[in-house]
């Protein structure tokens, strides 16, 4: 088990990933889930190496990533990220599932897959795990995931992302979501005022390259969205920043 040092707002040593996420989630708004983006980037701003964010991470980040998931009702993610990052069972260890049950949550978090076209192959690990519940959030009026999917699959066909996120609260009871990207999904959520916090890992790596993929795609934000630092932790040279997203 990796250890973290809290650097801000005060110093504390020897913390575990569970300690770091103990205050999560925040208070949900009245009409939608509380949403945090959980992202990683190299020191020069790249959100992936060789196409995968997982190639940037270390063991401490892996533990914090899964500890964050385990505090949430659901995981919001784009279909391409699921394919590239090889998603499987949402809560991947028994102790975390047991903690969730003790805290009144289902053993596994719900996966919310945001996709313009309903297109995931049957061999994706997320669909092969019978314990998973998958909600497909899509503007498409047709299309379904492969019938041989072992996971429980539901569809939320909604052309407006903000309305879709609100329906996740009203119709599916999801009060807290972690969004794991990718950048285009992030760029849809943030300008729409649907994100409450950004959890950003700064990796001590330089990747280089032309036109690097960053954590936020889409058009340039004008004006930029302002952030407030809530906590800052360190482990193995990696920095783990938790920001509040300022509302307009």
Language-model segment annotations:
Residues 1-248:
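Enzymes that bind and transform nitrogen-containing heteroaromatic metabolites
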């Amino acid at each position: 088990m990796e250890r973290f040092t809290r650097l801000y707002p005060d110093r504390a040593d020897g913390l575990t990933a569970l300690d770091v996420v103990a205050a999560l989630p925040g208070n949900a708004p009245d009409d939608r889930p509380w949403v945090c983006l959980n992202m990683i980037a190299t020191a020069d701003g790249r959100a992936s190496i060789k196409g995968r964010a997982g190639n940037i991470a270390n063991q401490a980040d892996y533990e914090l990533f899964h500890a964050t998931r385990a505090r949430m009702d659901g995981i919001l993610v784009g279909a391409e990220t699921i394919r590239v990052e090889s998603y499987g069972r949402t809560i991947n260890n028994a102790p975390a599932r047991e903690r969730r049950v003790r805290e009144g949550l289902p053993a596994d978090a719900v996966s919310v897959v945001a996709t313009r076209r309903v297109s995931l192959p049957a061999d994706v690990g997320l669909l092969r795990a019978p314990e998973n519940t998958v909600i497909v959030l899509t503007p498409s009026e047709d299309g379904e995931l492969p019938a041989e999917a072992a996971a429980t699959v539901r569809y939320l066909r909604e052309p407006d992302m903000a309305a879709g996120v609100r329906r996740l609260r009203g119709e599916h009871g999801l009060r807290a979501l972690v969004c794991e990207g990718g950048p285009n999904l992030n760029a849809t959520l943030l300008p729409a005022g649907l994100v409450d916090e950004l959890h950003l890992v700064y990796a001590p790596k330089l990747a280089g390259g032309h036109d690097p993929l960053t954590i936020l795609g889409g058009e340039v934000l004008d004006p930029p969205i302002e952030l407030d630092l809530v906590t800052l932790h360190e482990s193995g040279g990696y920095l783990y920043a938790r920001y509040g997203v300022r509302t307009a």
